[in-house]
Amino acid sequence: MELLGDTYFMCGDLREQHLREGPLSTWWLTPPGIDVDSFSARLGTTYDLMSHTFGAPAHPYRVFLRAHPHRGANASAHPASFVMAMNPSRPLDVGSLYETLAHELVHEWLHLDGSDHEKTWFVEGSADYYSLVLPLRAGMLDQAAFLAAVNVAARECYANPRRGLSIQQAQRLFFSDFLAHRLPYVRGMFYLADLDARLRRETAQKVRVDDLVRGVVRDRSAGEQIGISGWCTRVENTLHSPEMPHLDDLVITGAGRPSEDAFGSQFEMEMVDVPVPDFGFDSSTLVTGHVRGLVPAGAADRAGLHDREDIELPRYPEIVRMNVGDVLDIKVSRGGDSATISIPLTGATALVPQWRTRQHTTD
Ligand SMILES: [Zn+2]
């Protein structure tokens, strides 16, 4: 059954429509609307970087690009491959495209065993974490792009309208509510970043979270089953104090916050009050552009939106970046006329950690 879920069929003439570079190959039927040469080159470098970091030898790896008519891109990882869907007429910017491919690559190596709510935070959190920190360390991602991604993730985590959910509750909504869906990703990422800082602090910079992850990859490939308690044991072997309370705080309940030095001493952190993006309609509206579940007297209702009408609004990552006092502009078409409806972000706010490059002062 698992094999069937990982099976993809691509029908058509692929003789000209592929690119091979060492063990890597990229395949497409519809021209994907991106520079496949530079996409594949970046993929190759990132693949080498990751297989080296995770202590896993390189092997044949295939990327399949397919066309879809929607906004943005989505991707799913399978053994030795990933499939990425994108809209050739509205290609993603290079930065977002790279984040997605780096995230999918991590899935080739990093897994835990156990039920979904016990492992998804690690699988998706480590993919979000390493897709940012490894390219940063290798100079493939500059500090500004790294910080932008980390700070958006912090907002998605700590100002999420679903932030009060436990990881088990979030897992139950994983496929039906995109806000709950993001929680295991972002909580897992900030837990790993925080753990890396604790390990470095306690071992005078000798042990990193990479070392633990490499051990997991090695022992799982030798047939060992490693679940959440096995993970905690591995951390405790180095830190000599119970790990479950940290996991509970940062992942299971999400009540904790990562430490200031979670991403290294070159960054400093401050807590910023940011809007909780809750506009008085069902959160699916933000993805589908089709108003659902309008809350009477809620922000959208007060601004004049109607249930079940089609709207045009910024992509969710842009909405998450908005600050208190900003205004969300929504385009509505009614009877051939289009109007702009503005919703001021004056609702609930939450304190969220945001990092910036540390300014070195000389005295
Ligand atoms: Zn993923």
Residue ranges and their predicted role:
Residues 219-363:
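Beta/coil-rich, acidic/histidine-enriched accessory regions frequently appended to metallopeptidases
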